[in-house]
Amino acid sequence: KYAVIYFMAAVYFLDSMLVTRYPSEQLISCIRYTATIFFALWMVEYYDGEKLFHLIAAAQVIFTCLTFAFMLLRPGAVFSQEQGEHDFTGFLRTKNNAASQFSICILLQIAWFRILRAKQMIVSRKYLLSLLAQGIFLVLCNAKGAVLCLIFPLLYVLFGKYKEEPGKRLPLGVIYVTLSVAFLITALTILPLFQPLFSLIGKDATLTGRIPLWRQIIQVMINRHTFTGYGYGMFWRDRQAVAMVHQAFSRNSFMGSMTTGAHNVLLELWMNVGLFGVAAYFTAMIISTIGAERMEWTGYLFSAAYILWFMVFGWTERSMSTYEYQTLFLFIAMGSACNKQRVGPKRRQYVK
């Protein structure tokens, strides 16, 4: 049942090892990525959707407590130190890192609360207080993109009829692929027409310089390694490849020295595993989510909440590093979507 995910992992592994200029580092990167996938699928096999939500909520309570502790120990370090900014970062490196952490976990906790409500169970006070604190932290981050990532999937979590009407569940894979590609095309063609709307939220039509970067990346990838990429996680390690991106920008500008990613999940994948890898990813996403009406509703809720959030997040941010919680959650979501029937090892029973 997970064959399509295994296929994608195999494509990434084989492609990366064949094209990389750094075989030792590439092997480590591929092993880490594969281990993340296997761990995600192991969790899907042994925990149902409700338990997965519970584990994430419990982990986020710990994260919130650690954030408060860090604030007490180093109060001057929890806000951005860059000139002209005073955005909350907690103990993470940037406001966007912190905001994405709070954004996705707020969403998944609210989804868990809906499950508990359906079972007429009361939410523990510690989870409610943790959620409130995370909401305040998210506002302090002043990261509007993370809030936008939260809105659309949150509306579906709260008002969707996925439990009562399984036949009307969303085709998650098709939506993900279609809107992700459509966003890139729109951003590169007609987005400047919407400058007045972006001005209302304090942004510009270049998405803070992302669009010129995307155009240059596309130009680089059309000319070199179009179908194979540079190896998973290796593009930004390759000095020649990075130099080709930088040459379109002033040497003294941020983009002329930036090595922190494409700020778009699909472009980042293209750079690393080429069009073959992107095609394998799209195939895995679409096939794994076919037949959503046959999924256990709590598992579907996890898949829907995370895939919809990750879709919007991936429009303007990078992700899918070899081992990070966003990558782990993605393959838990895809694995849950594959798990249409209860087969294999018996799931552990949820005990409150």
Annotate each PLM feature.
Residues 1-14, 48-54, 113-125, 293, ...:
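Transmembrane signal-anchor hairpin modules in multi-pass inner-membrane enzymes, especially those
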Residues 2-13, 22-45, 55-58, 65, ...:
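Aromatic-anchored transmembrane helix interface
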Residues 53-79, 93-162, 287:
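Alpha-helical transmembrane segments of multi-pass inner-membrane proteins
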Residues 69-73, 140-141, 158-203, 219-223, ...:
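A membrane-periplasm/extracellular boundary helix in multi-pass inner-membrane enzymes
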Residues 86-91, 169-170, 184-216, 237-239, ...:
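Flexible juxtamembrane loops connecting transmembrane helices in multi-pass membrane enzymes
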Residues 107, 111, 154, 303-352:
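Transmembrane alpha-helices of multi-pass inner-membrane enzymes
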Residues 121-126, 155, 159-162, 168-171, ...:
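Hydrophobic transmembrane alpha-helices and their immediate junctions
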Residues 201-215, 219, 223-273:
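Long extracytoplasmic/lumenal interhelical loops at the membrane interface
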